[in-house]
A protein has these predicted regions:
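Core beta-strand elements of the Rossmann-like FAD/NAD(P) dinucleotide-binding domain
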Residues: 125-134
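Flavin-binding catalytic cores
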Residues: 170-179, 235-251, 297-325
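A glycine-rich dinucleotide-binding beta-alpha-beta segment and adjacent secondary-structure elements
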Residues: 292-358
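C-terminal catalytic lobe of FAD-dependent flavoproteins
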Residues: 263, 270-283, 287-302
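Conserved small/polar residues in nucleotide/adenosyl-binding loops
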Residues: 369-374
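A conserved FAD-binding loop/helix module that cradles the flavin
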Residues: 157-160, 357-367
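N-terminal Rossmann-fold NAD(P) dinucleotide-binding loop
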Residues: 2
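Conserved N-terminal/central alpha/beta ligand/cofactor-binding core
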Residues: 7-113, 126, 138-158, 162-168, ...
Length: 381
């Protein structure tokens, strides 16, 4: 959301500053290293048609491409790409650094400045004041972020990254209410420990696909497969035994999750009659052994996560890089926004992405395009 917002504003002539906590994490995909999918792939192509960059970046960094829903009509065909997570970041950064009118500043916003009900700027952790006609907040899961692995809690906006503090409270002073939501991410697996012969390979499609309508015909990176397998009743038994230490079920986490992101423990509780759940093992990049286990998002204790996964034949010798975890974060009630995503209480303050209670890279990116802020003449000075 932040990348598309900054690029759109600058390309339309506004003098723009993109403030980010870490320039080396611009456009970081916080969860799975993939773009598109059912309903979402169409959104990426609409972003591209409107002049956005998400499709171009995805095409440049894709390591697998597939079209989902082929059994349905063309309107339902959904492009989906696995991406190299790190190359995705650097492709976005290269684009943003070369857009006229766009400056990048590495810092953390802690306070908004408001006069007579209208935004006038922000103040950062370093004490720098930026005066602005318009401010777009795309803070993701970083506002007062708190991560959970079992009963262990650690402040942060993402694994090994600090949370953002004071900004929520600064906004709330102006009558904008906020709540807490939670989401989660799965373990990252060392590919050298996986028995691929016990999984079903899922190759990309050999016919050429891309997201962008721009004339880019080169497949930049080596194309890699994904793999699929299933949980089993022994896995579910171990997960059930760990539920007393699950933050989702022992009262440690009180907040709710956005739609479409259920944890594995939620699946076994919600669907106790299902003997198995499908998992997808996805490569994180062209040159890394790190793998993402789609379908096994969890905040259970690390030893429970590992013990359960080792009951799957392909993971009997499992080695992980880091456990799955849940994260709680602040969000702002979207009923306080106009249809343009401008806040009703503060003129020219816009929210986009996960801070509105949404989820997904594509949804976050496209929300920016519902806002007139970048193309409003009064904000271009």
């Amino acid at each position: 959301a932040g990348c598309e917002a900054a690029a759109a504003a600058a390309n339309l002539g506004s003098k723009t500053c993109l403030i980010t906590m870490d320039m080396n994490k611009i456009g970081q995909m916080s969860c799975n290293p993939a773009v598109g999918g059912i309903a979402k792939g169409q959104i990426v192509r609409e972003i591209d048609a409107l002049g956005g960059y998400m499709g171009l970046v995805t095409d440049q960094t894709a390591i697998q491409f597939r079209i989902l829903n082929r059994s349905k009509g063309p309107a339902m065909w959904s492009p989906r790409a696995q991406c190299d997570r790190n190359k995705f970041i650097w492709a976005w950064r290269e684009i943003l650094e070369n857009i006229p009118n766009l400056h990048i500043w590495q810092d953390t916003v802690q306070e908004i400045l408001v006069e007579n009900g209208e935004i006038t700027g922000v103040v950062t952790l370093w004490g720098v004041t930026f005066h602005a006609k318009c401010v777009v907040l795309t803070a993701g899961t970083f506002l007062n972020g708190l991560m959970h692995v079992g009963r262990t809690m650690l402040p942060g906006g993402r694994m090994a990254e600090p949370a953002s503090y004071q900004l929520t409270e600064s906004i709330a002073k102006h009558g904008i209410t906020f709540g807490r939501m939670k989401t989660g991410t799965p373990v990252r697996i060392d590919g050298r420990s996986v028995h691929y012969e016990d999984m079903e390979i899922q190759d990309g499609e050999c016919d050429f696909h891309k997201f962008s309508f721009m004339d880019t015909h080169v497949r930049h990176l080596k194309q890699l497969p994904c793999w699929t397998c299933f949980t089993n009743e022994e896995v579910h038994r171990i997960l059930q035994e760990g539920l007393p230490d699950s933050p989702l079920f022992n009262g440690q986490i009180q907040s709710i999750g956005p739609r479409y992101c259920p944890s594995i423990e939620t699946k076994i509780v919600t669907f106790p009659d299902k003997p198995q759940h499908q998992l997808f093992l996805e490569p994180e990049g062209e040159t890394t052994q790190e793998l993402y286990l789609n379908g096994f998002s969890s905040s259970l204790p690390m030893d429970i996560q590992i013990a359960a996964l080792k009951k799957i034949p392909a993971f009997r010798d499992l080695v992980i890089y880091r456990p799955g975890y849940a994260i709680e974060y602040d969000f702002f009630d979207p009923t306080q926004l106009k249809h343009t995503l401008e806040t009703k209480n503060i003129k020219n303050l816009f929210f986009a992405g996960q801070v509105n209670g949404t989820t997904g890279y594509e949804e976050a990116a496209c929300l920016l395009y519902t806002s007139p802020s970048p193309r409003d003449p009064k904000t271009s000075r």
